[in-house]
Amino acid sequence: MRFAASIAVALPVIHAASAQGFPPPVKGVTVVKSKFDENVKITYKENDICETTQGVRSFTGHVHLPPDNDDFGVYRNYSINTFFWFFEAREDPKNAPLSIWLNGGPGSSSMIGLFQENGPCWVNEDSKSTTNNSFSWNNKVNMLYIDQPNQVGFSYDVPTNITYSTINDTISVADFSNGVPAQNLSTLVGTGSSQNPWATANNTVNAARSIWHFAQVWFQEFPEHKPNNNKISIWTESYGGRYGPSFASYFQEQNEKIKNHTITEEGEMHILNLDTLGIINGCIDLMFQAESYAEFPYNNTYGIKAYTKEKRDAILHDIHRPDGCFDKVTKCREAAKEGDPHFYSNNATVNTICADANSACDKYLMDPFQETNLGYYDIAHPLQDPFPPPFYKGFLSQSSVLSDMGSPVNFSQYAQAVGKSFHGVGDYARPDVRGFTGDIAYLLESGVKVALVYGDRDYICNWFGGEQVSLGLNYTGTQDFHRAKYADVKVNSSYVGGVVRQHGNFSFTRVFEAGHEVPGYQPETALKIFERIMFNKDISTGEIDIAQKPDYGTTGTESTFHIKNDIPPSPEPTCYLLSADGTCTPEQLNAIKDGTAVVENYIIKSPAASKGNPPPTTTSSPTAAPTAGSAMLKAPVAMLAISALTVLAFFL
């Protein structure tokens, strides 16, 4: 990895006292200096911003790592200030296991998962208040949400003055030495990271190295977490299909080095006792999943015909033809194996080859879908998709919330610097040391539970591709997993939430009526799956102890494609100022730009948007829904949005 010789001196940061929009000065934080390194520290505050259950504690804070030599001997000339939000379990936190939650991107904040999916609260439509989530994942598990790599979400290198464009969702470094410009609907001011793409990890493996150093500090020195249960799990989503396998396998490798005394440095010898890796709608490996981008829009269980047969076949041709997607990815991986075997991304030739593969696959796979005007994260929704609701962005913009959190920077959902850094080296086309499917196999051989969970309406990391990954793994239990069949996921006495193939510690689950962010669509189903896996129960019923019956396998049907779904009603459009590029019509964007829009609690009331057209089908109505149980459970109202995809590896 190459780092800039220096980082520009940060502009003086103007605080809330002099300009609206900036975070207030940080006060009342607890500072814990590392007993291993005087330059390392943790700062944090206890608060009840989201978790309001009596007696249940939660903490927001940062782990601060100074500039230092990286693991491969190159000087890292920037600080890493990694944000965390820790929620104790609502039940028996001292004896509860702990799970890390990571969203993907690369560059997406884990506040997406916290507020739109599985955290203790939902943010209401007013963007100011919250509602308790009874299906929160911290009901029985201690949850640690982390913004990573550096500059993502509330994580930062150096606080820097910025402007934010609501029209195109972009952040720019600003010079306010001559005064702060007036804010309007299209331009806001605040404090963020440097936006320097050299001041963050530039690939998945380097992100794994960084998060391991964070974990060494947090698990040894954060004083508010002293559990009797030392098990650690990682649950992740989307680009987390790469983060999860790479991070977990790196943790496991480091554990082995600590045990055999290869690692002997004081402060870096804490065993991270891995229990589970969970991946929700993960984009894991292009070579397994690329074909699904052609097939899923053409032939899915909702009867949606987004592609013609001719279009599907043309995309498959572009995947397989000479110098097509697969050819370029193969060349990238061969070049990386030869020229960048340790995955530092410091070989310019390899970076160019892999970035070209990344861009080519994006062109062949993603560009055609843009023409459908359907949702990347929910094929049954329009492209301008208001679900899950983006109200948490306004909530996290409140001065009182930022003060209670002790954050010196404003929130940003997506870190442009991280995206540029990863895309510039072609990270999505690359493998890591074993390949990400090889990582999953390694973890299974090491006794770690692995769960793949996919909502069946997601396009961007769809369940067709996820199933191919599950069947393509090569480990000692491969044949047993293939012999297992699909069984119902029984959520309660009246509702079946999906189907699962499971053998022992490995499972693949298709969740009905869910898009990319499964817990946001099906909170009860997602919670049942999560808790059953975490507590060693079978996913189908929750009644069989997998630890006692390690050879357990599901029985049922070989395939699930015969289970068809109804297309849901189109969600009511909601143009949200802080997600304008993904939730607003061109007319509304123009009104925001010229200042004529009527806005209430970040929602554009005028001009109003019309409801989108239903997705195309071959029949007047699809076949019956998969269950006769109760209607699906949803989070209260309705999505975050990102810019139209311009690169393949731009996921949540």
Swiss-Prot record:
Biased-composition ranges, Low complexity, are: 618-627
Prodomain positions? 630-652
Secretion signal span: 1-19
What is the pH-activity profile? Optimum pH is 4.5.
Sites of GPI-anchor amidated glycine lipid attachment are 629
> Sugar-bearing residues?
77, 132, 161, 168, 184, 202, 260, 299, 347, 410, 474, 492, 505
Topology of the protein relative to the lipid bilayer = Lipid-anchor; GPI-anchor
An example Gene Ontology molecular-function term = serine-type carboxypeptidase activity
The superkingdom listed in its UniProt entry is: Eukaryota
The reaction(s) this protein catalyses: Preferential release of a C-terminal arginine or lysine residue
Name the residues annotated as catalytic in the UniProt entry.
238, 458, 516
Q: Where is this region: Disordered?
A: 608-627
Under the cellular component aspect of Gene Ontology, which terms does the record hold?
fungal-type vacuole; plasma membrane; side of membrane
Q: Keyword Membrane, does the record have it?
A: yes
Q: Name one GO biological process term.
A: proteolysis
Q: Where does substrate bind?
A: 461, 517
User: Which InterPro entries does the UniProt record give?
Assistant: AB_hydrolase_fold (IPR029058), Peptidase_S10 (IPR001563), Ser_caboxypep_ser_AS (IPR018202)
Keywords tagged on the record: Carboxypeptidase, Cell membrane, Disulfide bond, Glycoprotein, GPI-anchor, Hydrolase, Lipoprotein, Membrane, Protease, Signal, Virulence
Q: Which cysteines are joined by disulfide bonds?
A: 50-121, 325-361, 332-354
Top EC category = hydrolase
- The keyword Lipoprotein is annotated on this UniProt entry: yes
Subcellular location(s) per record = Cell membrane
> What are the EC numbers?
3.4.16.6
Q: In UniProt terms, what function does this protein have?
A: Extracellular serine carboxypeptidase that contributes to pathogenicity.
Q: What is this protein called?
A: Carboxypeptidase S1 homolog A
